[in-house]
């Protein structure tokens, strides 16, 4: 018999591995950054829940849309690093969400496509 946390962590690990697999196919330069996101999820209690929430926000708002071809982010590794640097112990994720909004705005701006 396993604990509830074990089941939740198992589900998270499976998703993390899936994101690594997608990075290998879609943006190999981002593999190391995606692997390193695992260090965001650690500890117990509030710290653990906050790290997991921040991880899901970065994956859902940057990595997954990039891998799906919805977000034209050419340097996902740098975007993940920037988002991780903005992650603070804030349950509302204000700093992280602001940083992600800026990253997404830069990626979708006409100037971003002119540089390519």
Where are these regions (language model features)?
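C-terminal amphipathic alpha-helical interaction region
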Residues: 1-116
